[in-house]
């Protein structure tokens, strides 16, 4: 996603965070009309497969679209969005390139589960499975980003060069490149392409 200015970016993030905290906004990003409409209809459609009422889902859950368009925002501001959804049941909808990051946040945060949009034969069943609280660590389908890889991804997303990252992480530049290469293999993309 390309931002016009830092002000525009900050406003957009604050607007997203406000949307998440409002009780009537349980799907993020509400600005992605197709995702919002599609997921809203899908949740209503699977009503008979889930144990909770639709009202409880709207009140207690937040469904987050981890699309490649928004990954930069999630990576750079993961403490902010994770704080904003504290106390909610968070369900991550992960595209292929965001699966490893979704797994990282699942392991390191209070995430209810991950729906792998690219792998799912029946997304209705996958979504119901997660909403019903059945998603467990054994259900992780792909690799996860390690803590060290995540630090390097964050710093790369901020525009830092490998030498600077190596100094901060107290490691060699070669180690930075190794972690970056490993992360890129898990993300099916170069980091700089995901965080543009």
UniProtKB/Swiss-Prot annotation:
Stored Pfam families: GerE
Highest taxon of the lineage: Bacteria
Compartments, record wording: Cytoplasm
Any one GO CC term of the record: cytoplasm
Limits of the HTH luxR-type domain: 138-196
GO molecular function, one term: DNA binding
Induction / repression: Negatively regulated by H-NS. Positively autoregulated. Also positively regulated by IHF.
InterPro entries per record: Sig_transdc_resp-reg_C-effctor (IPR016032), Tscrpt_reg_LuxR_C (IPR000792), WH-like_DNA-bd_sf (IPR036388)
GO biological process: regulation of DNA-templated transcription
SUPFAM superfamilies, sorted: C-terminal effector domain of the bipartite response regulators (SSF46894)
Sorted UniProt keywords: Activator, Cytoplasm, DNA-binding, Transcription, Transcription regulation
Family membership: Belongs to the EcpR/MatA family.
Function: Part of the ecpRABCDE operon, which encodes the E.coli common pilus (ECP). ECP is found in both commensal and pathogenic strains and plays a dual role in early-stage biofilm development and host cell recognition. Positively regulates the expression of the ecp operon.
Name used for this protein in its record: HTH-type transcriptional regulator EcpR
Organism expressing this protein natively: Escherichia coli O139:H28 (strain E24377A / ETEC)
